[in-house]
Amino acid sequence: MAFKKDKPVYIVDTTLRDGEQTAGVVFANNEKIRIAQMLDEIGIDQLEVGIPTMGGDEKETVAKIAKLGLKASIMAWNRAVVKDVQESLECGVDAVAISISTSDIHIEHKLKKTRQWVLDSMTEAVRFAKKEGVYVSVNAEDASRTDMNFLIEFARCAKQAGADRLRFCDTVGFLDPFKTYEMVKAIKDAVDIEIEMHTHNDFGMATANALAGVKAGAKFVGVTVNGLGERAGNAALEEVVMALKYVYKMDLGIDTSRFREISEYVALASGRPLPPSKAIVGKNVFAHESGIHVDGALKNPYTYEVFDPQEVGLERQIVIGKHSGTAALINKFKEYGRVLTEEEANLLLPHVRKMAIQLKRPLFDKELMYLYEDVIVKGKAKAI
């Protein structure tokens, strides 16, 4: 597998592996295939699609995805066990992720082994995979809580064994962006190996930590659609891509206009509805109600928006409610094909706010029209 040389960052989507490891989430086989196709269509570089050593439907679906002829690299996840890697190779994938714990708490309490055993197991699995000619990512599980000297030694051993990159796993979402930058830069300075960020959201910093890793020299970022994943989830595909584009000025050539569509599909397939305020793709992200905000957004959308909503498959919404001002009312009636004067807007506004308070929500279009009929139309009739 050869990645294009001209891209500043490569996106590795693990919705179908780590995303499906969200407690209670199971994708149907056809859903996994459709998600893989959708992600490939928008230009994702690599898809981590499952764990073949589970056997059964899992292995069968990984093999089906590998045979689709997608443009993206297809990766399967493995423990640092030769048998696992063999199972993946039988599926026809072009890349394997070989994962093993590196922190002392994992080595001593979960694996009940030694650091040397970790190095030996990883090396054996990597060498086997490279002999078979596939791309290899070595996953340092719980890297964020690993002794720095050992983490560098682990990275060096992975490189010597032939690994193509190191996946830096903040497995329990323990880091902040400052520490992330420090650790990733230390690895990059010590070992000539590509690094992938794999960050979890336990403290709400998954996306920020992923960006910090990129700042420190990581060229790969692992993500999931909607931030699905173990516990609090992973860095979200849509957040990372848009942040890289607008914060770091890195356009990855991904068709972001389908983000909302893909997010909705994954939300439905996973049984995890999208929160209205979900960053980038939530329905409220481009919804404006406050009078000052609406006035600014109507004059120039970029006063209160960083990018055009159509860029991620959304539309701007002007919501009429308690905090609305006259500019919002005038604009809303323009959408209805009616001209509302400034005087009429000032007359209607108190009634709008009162109804919104009574209903404890914004007004629907019909309700706004009823108010208009009662306050403006009938008011004029009475005046005559």
Curated annotation (Swiss-Prot):
Its EC number is 2.3.3.13. InterPro entries: AIPM/Hcit_synth_CS, Aldolase_TIM, LeuA/HCS_post-cat, NifV/FrbC, PYR_CT. Residues 9-260 form the Pyruvate carboxyltransferase domain. The keyword Metal-binding applies. Keywords: Amino-acid biosynthesis, Branched-chain amino acid biosynthesis, Cytoplasm, Leucine biosynthesis, Manganese, Metal-binding, Transferase. One of its GO terms (molecular function) is metal ion binding. Its cofactor is Mn(2+). Pfam families: HCS_D2 (PF22617), HMGL-like (PF00682). It is found in: Cytoplasm. GO terms for biological process: L-leucine biosynthetic process. It is an enzyme of class 2 (transferase). It comes from the Bacteria. The keyword Thylakoid does not apply. Mn(2+) binds at D18, H198, H200, N234. Homodimer. Belongs to the alpha-IPM synthase/homocitrate synthase family. LeuA type 1 subfamily. This is 2-isopropylmalate synthase 2. It comes from Caldanaerobacter subterraneus subsp. tengcongensis (strain DSM 15242 / JCM 11007 / NBRC 100824 / MB4). The gene is leuA2.
